[in-house]
């Protein structure tokens, strides 16, 4: 005998791929008589070769399909549910063969069919409950023309029995009624045992057997308890009198039975409970409540006492030392009188032992003002070495650990953007540093005697120090140069390049005076000062004398040329 494979649909073949005993999900058509598809053919819409046969419709994509799980998948899905058994019912979620609604339970399916499809639409369908039931799976006639009638005749009674058997048994919770005072015998309440003896006789026999097996002390306690329980039934005996007298001088409350046919001589005795006073007893008989006028007078007397105490208090006065304090005088001029009284009250209530003023370090001491000299001669000292700071402060803040968020630093979603942002900032800062380095190297090459050679990249300052050694950058001048204001510039006549035939060229002044002006920033680089103080008076006189003699000769030559020019038009005759 061949053992069927676990998790396969035995005896079923796929009409799409013709594979027998396939595994996985099985899809059963609820319109066609015998049409099944595997999971692969259902998802790819492989419906196989269908031949047109009389009275047999061809399968269409719109036909409702019922999902049937394999045994392995069923156990995995409904594991731990004692009401689901694959051997009894292999379908849990049903599909309507009319409107193709899925996800219906047995009860929901029946309600849906009876309410939505009471009349047959005119074609036969397959009942999904018959397919899911193992006992009805191999029945030949599974098709029905009226599903509502089929449900009422076949499945309704079976489903009711199934629901009744699977529903959990609900029991009412036991409610303990409070024990009330026992009353007398009621009519028709006396119970008898199976042998015909009263129930009290059985209890008495059991009680007697219990008394024989117990000690003398316990016997006495049980006997007293028995007498107490039988007091309502025997009101005239001696035990009831003893019990009532033990309660003191309290009056006995006797309540007659409400039953009309009961013996009128039988009375019910109720033992009053002992009361414990909440408040201690008082000698007077005024009662618990206080009259309203008395209460009002008491409140008024308390208010009067408070006012009297306030009047008796001595007024707040200032001490002699406080009156002479300059800070207190200034403070009084800036705040109101109420604030002054409040401060005095606070100072009076929080008085402390007077301490020596000399032993305490002042909070604020004014630093003596120093006259500022040149910027190079001003020296600063730290507060720890020299005089104390002008305003030392002490801040009390919350620790950073208490306000931090630990989850933020452990979450990778936040750390990754921070890392990327940090890398971008580092890259941008490196680029800026390289640009500045190139500019610095260009300046160094222009000002150094020879180009520095950086043999060790980690120590570039050594090469720079050797290259810039002639500039003496680290040495301070023995005497500071005094600042001199720039002199007014004299406008010199401009030379016309058209008349002179020369291009105007700006020649920088490389003299000591010009270099100083360029460094100080008074004159832009490359601009020649139009008036230079380096020209001495003697040179000016020589230049002036030479210019005067030369000017006379030039004037004579110009006069001769003018006379010649004037004689030219007389000699030329124009006919």
From Swiss-Prot:
Q: In which pathway does it act?
A: Protein modification; protein ubiquitination
Give the chief site where it resides: cytoplasm
Query: Which stretches of sequence are listed as region Disordered?
Result: 277-306, 530-575
GO terms (BP aspect):
regulation of cell communication; regulation of signaling; synaptic signaling
The protein's Enzyme Commission number? 2.3.2.27
* Keyword line: Cytoplasm, DNA-binding, Endosome, Lysosome, Metal-binding, Transferase, Zinc, Zinc-finger
List the catalysed reactions: S-ubiquitinyl-[E2 ubiquitin-conjugating enzyme]-L-cysteine + [acceptor protein]-L-lysine = [E2 ubiquitin-conjugating enzyme]-L-cysteine + N(6)-ubiquitinyl-[acceptor protein]-L-lysine
Q: Where is the composition biased (Acidic residues)?
A: 297-306, 530-563
- GO MF terms, alphabetically ordered: DNA binding; zinc ion binding
Locations listed in the record: Cytoplasm; Late endosome; Lysosome
Which residues of this UniProt protein bind Zn(2+) 2? 29, 32, 59, 63
Tell me the residue numbers annotated for binding Zn(2+) 1: 14, 17, 38, 41
The UniProt entry, under InterPro entries, shows: Di19_Zn-bd, KCMF1/Dystrophin, Znf_ZZ, Znf_ZZ_sf
Q: Which GO terms describe its cellular component?
A: nucleus; plasma membrane; synapse
Q: Which Gene3D superfamilies match?
A: 3.30.60.90
ZZ-type Zn finger ranges: 9-73
State what this protein does. Answer: E3 ubiquitin-protein ligase which accepts ubiquitin from an E2 ubiquitin-conjugating enzyme and then transfers it to targeted substrates, promoting their degradation by the proteasome.
**Family statement:** Belongs to the KCMF1 family.
List the protein's name: E3 ubiquitin-protein ligase kcmf-1
**Which species is the source of this protein?**
Caenorhabditis elegans
- What gene is behind this protein? kcmf-1
């Amino acid at each position: 005998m061949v053992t069927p494979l676990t998790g396969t649909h035995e005896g079923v073949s796929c009409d799409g791929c013709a594979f027998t005993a396939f595994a996985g999900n099985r899809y059963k058509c609820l319109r066609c008589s015998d049409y099944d598809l595997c999971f692969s053919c259902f998802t790819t819409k492989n419906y196989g070769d269908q031949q047109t046969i009389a009275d047999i419709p061809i399968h269409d994509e719109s036909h409702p399909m019922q999902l049937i799980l394999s045994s392995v998948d069923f156990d995995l899905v409904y594991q731990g549910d004692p009401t689901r058994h694959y051997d009894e019912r292999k379908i849990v979620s049903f599909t309507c063969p009319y409107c193709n609604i899925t996800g219906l339970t047995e009860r929901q399916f029946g309600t849906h069919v009876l309410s939505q499809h009471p009349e047959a639409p005119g074609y036969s369908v397959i009942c999904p409950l018959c397919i899911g039931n193992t006992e009805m799976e191999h029945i030949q006639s599974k098709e029905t023309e009226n599903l509502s009638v089929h449900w009422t005749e076949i499945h309704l009674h079976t489903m009711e029995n199934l629901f009744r058997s699977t529903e959990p048994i609900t029991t009412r919770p036991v409610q303990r009624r409070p024990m009330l005072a026992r009353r007398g015998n009621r009519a028709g309440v006396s119970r008898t045992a199976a042998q015909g003896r009263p129930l009290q006789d059985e209890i008495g026999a059991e009680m007697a057997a219990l008394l024989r097996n117990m000690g003398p002390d316990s016997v006495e306690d049980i006997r007293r308890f028995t007498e107490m329980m039988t007091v309502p039934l025997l009101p005239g005996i001696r035990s009831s009198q003893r019990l009532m007298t033990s309660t003191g001088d309290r009056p006995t409350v006797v309540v007659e039975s409400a039953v009309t046919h009961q013996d009128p001589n039988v009375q019910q005795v109720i033992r009053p409970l002992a009361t414990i006073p909440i408040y201690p007893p008082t000698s007077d008989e005024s009662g618990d409540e206080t009259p309203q006028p008395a209460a009002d007078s008491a409140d008024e007397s308390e208010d009067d006492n408070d006012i009297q105490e306030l009047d008796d208090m001595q007024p707040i006065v200032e001490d002699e030392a406080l009156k002479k304090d300059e800070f207190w005088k200034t403070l009084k001029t800036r705040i109101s009188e109420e604030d002054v009284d409040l401060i005095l009250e606070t100072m009076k209530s929080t008085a402390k032992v007077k301490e020596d003023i000399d032993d305490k370090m002042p909070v604020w001491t004014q630093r003596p003002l120093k006259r500022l000299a040149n910027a190079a001669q001003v020296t600063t000292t730290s507060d720890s070495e020299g005089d104390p700071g002008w305003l030392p402060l002490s801040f009390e803040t919350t620790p950073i650990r208490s306000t931090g968020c630990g989850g933020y630093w452990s979450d990778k979603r936040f750390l990754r953007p921070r890392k990327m942002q940090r890398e971008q900032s580092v890259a941008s800062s490196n680029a800026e540093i390289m640009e500045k380095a190139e500019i610095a190297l260009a300046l160094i090459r222009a000002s150094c005697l020879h180009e520095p050679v950086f043999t060790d990249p980690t120590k570039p300052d050594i090469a720079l120090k050797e290259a810039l050694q002639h500039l003496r950058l680290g040495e301070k001048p023995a005497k500071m140069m005094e600042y001199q204001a720039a002199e007014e510039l004299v406008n010199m006549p401009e030379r016309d390049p058209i008349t002179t035939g020369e291009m105007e060229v700006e020649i920088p002044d490389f003299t000591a005076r010009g270099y100083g002006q360029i460094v100080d920033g008074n004159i832009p680089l490359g601009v020649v000062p139009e008036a230079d103080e380096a020209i001495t008076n003697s040179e000016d006189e020589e230049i002036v004398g030479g210019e005067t003699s030369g000017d006379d000769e030039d004037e004579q030559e110009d006069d001769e040329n003018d006379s010649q020019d004037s004689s030219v038009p007389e000699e030329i005759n124009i006919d």
